[in-house]
């Protein structure tokens, strides 16, 4: 009933808009512009390139790398260990948690937190902190009511978290003891750290039930948690994936076309950390990159399907939508800016950054998400879902505009161009005139900012040019191997070349990578991009429906790397993690389609 009313309302609004003067005026301009545009040499060239690409029969080659062999060996050993020690308490606990319903897990977590809060209440009451102990007592009572409500299946909560399995006395005792032990750490760790430990235990227990919850938490952490906590969630996710694979009844290792390149990059990162000019400074970037490559290898081994990836995409867009709303609020209230974020002569008063360090990093994040919105809009048939996606995308796009990040805008445009070009050229040719007309409707402040792209009158552009010149000098002195992984290595070596400033990085991803890991390392990063392009192209020809999601992830990477021509985009930990997460998603979708086609071919043969 609701969907019917919603559809009628949307149809009425669309009809009203189509009959309005504004729509007719701009549509007439669009038709005239479209006529000139389609007759241009640019369009003819696009069709020639598209025909060449479409006619190519590229099939990505797969071979097991050394990293694959090592990981396969470790995972098989883990599975054997699990099978041999299934009666051990720790493994039994993991298996039982996986078999529990969400209602039961929520109930036992409620008991654990109730006991922890009760112990905290007693300890603070003994210290004389009666106000805090009263608050903790109320919190303890609240968590106990959650436990009792779900255990007895009474109240409102069981309507949302159904529990069919019984809670045993042993399980109650185990979680109560866990709460007492966690509370016992309070005098040693302090309230903040002890509470973080308790919440960490709840998180680990919850995500052990379902790996996708760990991945969802990881996506959420990238936007809303500090770097250190995000890294903690990331490594918990890796542990949960390992446990999930180890608990499988059967296991078949998946090999993909990028395995060898990932292994080579991992080797380069390792060598350039050991031989870095600032070894301790390189460790941060090594942990982020090596951990992410391990995540990709493990992520590919999970039993995933395209529906799970749809949920991941929805959650990525939803979290970006929340960040986008926060950015819009910042723009409305006029959040204070740092002096280095904008040229004093530009007239810009506010640049939004949401939960990120600065507007450029926020733009890097947003432009990676936007192409996923295109993929959902094309895949979804329901008008309601399309409108919701469009609304969320509108908030994300508005926030991107308010970052006033020129590199971000260029990246977003490149991502849209690539997505539509690879998906369907006719859609791109319709989009370009609409985009050009849309430019005329943008505020003057945004148009002025766009016009300053490449202008040496702009202080930030002039500064970048100077840094690029010095970066090229460093590359000439360390051409093949670079100076060491990470921005700290760049900072240390650049002090010998740049005396008038102290830049954190080269303000260009390609120059920065060449400085850090040499031209050889940069070559293999580019090779990884080309390999991913080949995989996306192949899947689009084989299964366009699933390939569309894959294309959304790839266009997000391209958006980021185009932005990388004016900024070092692989500097912030969260962007590094998201970059490799996207590579992992492309790799996993490729693996899913490959497996489905093999099963289909086997059925036909039999």
Each language-model region and where it sits:
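Loop-to-helix entry and N-terminal half of a specific, functionally important transmembrane alpha helix
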Residues: 392, 508, 537-566, 582, ...
